[in-house]
């Protein structure tokens, strides 16, 4: 039995008090939540301190909160900020634990079957276990997640019911505890003590929970009774203190007992028989043979080991769900009245909508060709309407809310005024004729003042040509293309801020972490070419890149005024007028943001190495050259898998294995 701790309030720690229009935004959001409003939008301009406002709301409504971001990097940044705001509460991080993941796939055109291949990040796996155990043990929990939170996770009831609860004085023999640990997927290893393992020394059992990375527990027995439970350092064995209660959650999120396993296997066998009849009736004998061989092997593994590769494909039977019923996800671990906050909702909600269809298309091919049973289709992410069914109360947070959010609610809380008094930049439109010379003059003005420039183009060729032209003109310039990885991008931004170069050119400068206070000019080329990066939302987001500098200015180069341009200019002017009126009333003089220049530390502690171009004659390489080539190939393999080019990813994987075999 899990004793959930007494309700503990969120305690926000910050040296700042709410300012600008943060106080009215916080009050409005809290009032709406407390009055039972299901959905609302926080329309916060860039740099107005939306994360701080979110933290204030969480601390005042005191509900377990799920914050969803649209990628790992952004989730990592938010996790760090919330940890600083709530040092005494449980702030957790839940993203995909795969460093590399190539899903199982079949390509009929070339009759190519590609097995699932992945590498798991142990640090992130630990953080995921920490998130689920915190949700079951306490109320003061904030989980910052990517859209991985809508993927299947296993039953929270099975997970909670399987937990082993221990107290000093409890009657339980050492062997009973060992059996209980094995049942919840802990592994005995008396030599290599790691997460999810235990070791035994006489009447002492040491257990390393899956949710910890440095601290383990020592359980000391006196006969068939627990004498004492101590928290220890896993590496040195140093005693940190006594514990009066210890709850050990399963070492994996997918757990089941023997009785349940036999029931699941019976259902798998029944489904196999039905599908074999169907294939044989259609004359698909190869598919029938393939399915029988594979499924019977998996059943044997489940009986003997309690596990098989791809066990998640049988999750419908394991969970006791009906066909088509949604899987259990992280959302099921929360209590019913929890709060959801969607960061950058204009991006995140689109991702949530698209996950299901992409997953189904790939799995349907595996089912049609006899690689998987039809029930594998129920190991999937939630549909958007299924996600909506989990929503008790939700806050969409964005500078440019999407159509979906606007359809969900009319309740919009604006946060336009920045605590620094900074204004939205002035925007002007200039003709594209002679834009290069005009732009060069504007850049030189900024260089003289020690300021920086962003230029956004629509095509790779234009970005490259412009980079070459500016270099010839003596401008220190860099082009940031889409192939650059997160940490390399951070290095480029740092160099721009330090003045190593003065101009950054890119196609999509809306990525996270590209807010640079030193940038006073943003130039938008081909502003009149309607599309993703030149629609109203894209333009407003791009304009916002100049909003962290007191002299922020935006120039759109265009031959005509599109509706998107006009709406973006009008909205920016509206916000600027509100900000100017506030500054005048309160005697505030806008000051450029002072922001420390520091390197980003990845949440997973992984360092992305710069890889050299791989040569084709691998055997003539030195060992270190081969290692560099392997890193580059792994990067290419991951990108191929993300683009669903499974054949190329499989070829690269095989090449990596060959290279590793040389050494």
From Swiss-Prot:
SMART domains: DEXDc (SM00487), HELICc (SM00490). InterPro entries: Helicase/UvrB_N, Helicase_ATP-bd, Helicase_C-like, P-loop_NTPase, UVR_dom, UVR_dom_sf, UvrB, UvrB_inter. Residues 435-601 form the Helicase C-terminal domain. Pfam families: Helicase_C, ResIII, UVR, UvrB, UvrB_inter. One of its GO terms (cellular component) is excinuclease repair complex. Its main location: cytoplasm. Residues 627-662 form the UVR domain. ATP binds at residues 44-51. Keywords: ATP-binding, Cytoplasm, DNA damage, DNA excision, DNA repair, Excision nuclease, Helicase, Hydrolase, Nucleotide-binding, SOS response. A motif (Beta-hairpin) lies at residues 97-120. The keyword Glycoprotein does not apply. One of its GO terms (molecular function) is DNA binding. It is found in: Cytoplasm. Residues 31-271 form the Helicase ATP-binding domain. The UvrABC repair system catalyzes the recognition and processing of DNA lesions. A damage recognition complex composed of 2 UvrA and 2 UvrB subunits scans DNA for abnormalities. Upon binding of the UvrA(2)B(2) complex to a putative damaged site, the DNA wraps around one UvrB monomer. DNA wrap is dependent on ATP binding by UvrB and probably causes local melting of the DNA helix, facilitating insertion of UvrB beta-hairpin between the DNA strands. Then UvrB probes one DNA strand for the presence of a lesion. Belongs to the UvrB family. PANTHER family: UVRABC SYSTEM PROTEIN B (PTHR24029:SF0). Forms a heterotetramer with UvrA during the search for lesions. Interacts with UvrC in an incision complex. The beta-hairpin motif is involved in DNA binding. This is UvrABC system protein B. It comes from Streptococcus equi subsp. zooepidemicus (strain MGCS10565). The gene is uvrB.
């Amino acid at each position: 039995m899990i004793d959930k701790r007494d309700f503990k309030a969120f305690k926000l720690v910050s040296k700042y008090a709410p300012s600008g229009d943060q106080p009215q935004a916080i009050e409005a959001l809290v009032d709406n939540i407390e009055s039972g409003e299901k959905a609302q939008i926080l329309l916060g301009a860039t740099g107005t301190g939306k994360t701080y406002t979110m933290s204030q709301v969480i601390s005042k409504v005191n509900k377990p909160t799920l914050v969803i971001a649209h990628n790992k990097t952004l989730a990592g940044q938010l996790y760090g900020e919330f940890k600083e705001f709530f040092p005494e509460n449980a702030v957790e991080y839940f993203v995909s634990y795969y460093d590399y993941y190539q899903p199982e796939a079949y390509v009929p055109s070339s009759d190519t079957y590609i097995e699932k291949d992945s590498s798991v990040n142990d640090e992130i796996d630990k953080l995921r276990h920490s998130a689920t155990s915190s949700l079951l043990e306490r109320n003061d929990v904030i989980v910052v997640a990517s859209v991985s939170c809508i993927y299947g996770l296993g039953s929270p009831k099975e997970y909670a019911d399987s937990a082993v609860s221990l107290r000093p004085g409890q009657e339980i023999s050492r062997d009973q505890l060992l059996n209980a640990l094995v049942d919840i997927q802990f592994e005995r290893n008396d030599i290599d003590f790691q997460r999810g393992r235990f070791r035994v020394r006489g009447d002492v059992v040491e257990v390393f929970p899956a949710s910890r990375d440095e601290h383990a527990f020592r359980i000391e027995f006196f006969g068939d009774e627990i004498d004492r439970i101590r928290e220890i350092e896993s590496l040195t064995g140093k005693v940190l203190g006594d514990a009066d209660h210890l709850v050990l959650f399963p070492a994996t999120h997918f757990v089941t007992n023997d009785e349940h396993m036999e029931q699941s296997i019976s259902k798998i066998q029944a489904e196999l028989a039905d599908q074999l009849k169907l294939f044989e009736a259609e004359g698909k004998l190869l598919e029938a043979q393939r399915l029988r061989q594979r499924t019977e092997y998996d059943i044997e593994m489940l009986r003997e080991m309690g596990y098989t590769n791809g066990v998640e494909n049988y999750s419908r039977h394991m969970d006791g769900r009906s066909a088509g019923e949604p899987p259990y996800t992280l959302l099921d671990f929360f209590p019913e009245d929890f709060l959801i906050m969607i960061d950058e909702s204009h991006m995140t909600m689109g991702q949530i909508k698209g996950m299901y269809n992409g997953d189904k298309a790939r799995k349907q091919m595996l089912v049609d060709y006899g690689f998987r049973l039809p029930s594998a289709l129920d190991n999937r992410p939630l549909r958007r309407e299924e996600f909506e069914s989990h929503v008790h109360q939700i806050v969409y947070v964005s500078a440019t809310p999407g159509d979906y959010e606007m359809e969900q609610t009319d309740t919009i809380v604006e946060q336009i005024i920045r605590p620094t008094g900074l204004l939205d930049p002035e925007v002007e439109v200039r003709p594209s004729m002679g834009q290069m010379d005009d732009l060069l003059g504007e850049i030189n003005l900024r260089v003289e003042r020690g300021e920086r420039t962003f230029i956004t183009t629509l095509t790779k060729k234009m970005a490259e040509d412009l980079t070459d032209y500016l270099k010839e003109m003596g401008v220190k310039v860099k082009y940031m293309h889409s192939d650059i990885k997160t940490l390399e991008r951070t290095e480029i931004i740092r160099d721009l801020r330090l003045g190593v170069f003065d101009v950054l050119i890119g196609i999509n400068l809306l990525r996270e972490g590209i807010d640079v206070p030193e940038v006073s000019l943003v130039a938008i080329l081909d502003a009149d070419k309607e599309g993703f990066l030149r629609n109203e939302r894209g333009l407003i987001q791009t304009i916002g890149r100049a909003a962290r500098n007191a002299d922020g200015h935006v120039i759109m180069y265009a031959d005509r005024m599109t509706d998107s341009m006009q709406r973006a200019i009008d909205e920016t002017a509206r916000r600027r007028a509100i900000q100017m009126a506030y500054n005048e009333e309160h005697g505030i003089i806008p000051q450029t943001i002072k922001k420390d220049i520091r390197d980003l530390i990845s949440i997973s502690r992984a360092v992305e190495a710069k890889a050299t171009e791989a040569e084709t004659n691998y055997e003539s390489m030195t060992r270190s050259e081969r290692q560099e080539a392997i890193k580059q190939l792994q990067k290419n393999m991951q990108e191929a898998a993300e683009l669903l080019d499974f054949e190329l990813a499989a070829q690269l994987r095989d090449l990596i294995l060959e290279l590793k075999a040389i050494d």
